[in-house]
Amino acid sequence: MTSRLARLWQPGNPQRRVFLPDFWMAVIESPSVGRNKLPRNCVKFEVDPRMSRHDIREYLTKIYDLPVRDVRTEVQMGDITWNTKLDHQYKKAMWKEEDKKIAYVFMSKDFAFSFPQMFAASEEVVELAKMTKQQEELKEKLNEQYANRNRRVGQFLAA
């Protein structure tokens, strides 16, 4: 599906033209742990709402040469903004965000997808993470001094 029309053929012009679709796809990062974790060979995309499963499969196999095995789609309803949240009798919808179409694309079993690291972690962020980890360790050591403190009283009385 494309919004461009093929030009009329004129003698001497080449006939082969490639029209790319007007669709868009965006990779969504999925959690690496928990119940929402996806298998290694599954990739989550937010796609143009007009795309069908067949369009998604063709887009990925023909343009990006990916080994697509299965495509599953889901339409997520956009959030609704109400004029009054608590008055259930007279509340009216003021605004609704557009619906999103999510595609779960399963690749062949030997394919492993990892979310691309777009920006390298800066030195400040790495240093801040080290400091935070160090603070947590110190906090745990301090808590160990006071944890179960009352249990030591028996040692003094039994002497």
Swiss-Prot record:
<keyword id="KW-0687">Ribonucleoprotein</keyword>
<dbReference type="InterPro" id="IPR012678">
    <property type="entry name" value="Ribosomal_uL23/eL15/eS24_sf"/>
</dbReference>
<dbReference type="GO" id="GO:0032543">
    <property type="term" value="P:mitochondrial translation"/>
</dbReference>
<dbReference type="GO" id="GO:0003735">
    <property type="term" value="F:structural constituent of ribosome"/>
</dbReference>
<dbReference type="InterPro" id="IPR012677">
    <property type="entry name" value="Nucleotide-bd_a/b_plait_sf"/>
</dbReference>
<comment type="similarity">
    <text>Belongs to the universal ribosomal protein uL23 family.</text>
</comment>
<keyword id="KW-0689">Ribosomal protein</keyword>
<dbReference type="GO" id="GO:0005762">
    <property type="term" value="C:mitochondrial large ribosomal subunit"/>
</dbReference>
<keyword id="KW-0496">Mitochondrion</keyword>
<protein>
    <recommendedName>
        <fullName>Large ribosomal subunit protein uL23m</fullName>
    </recommendedName>
</protein>
<dbReference type="InterPro" id="IPR013025">
    <property type="entry name" value="Ribosomal_uL23-like"/>
</dbReference>
<comment type="subunit">
    <text>Component of the mitochondrial ribosome large subunit (39S) which comprises a 16S rRNA and about 50 distinct proteins.</text>
</comment>
<dbReference type="Pfam" id="PF00276">
    <property type="entry name" value="Ribosomal_L23"/>
</dbReference>
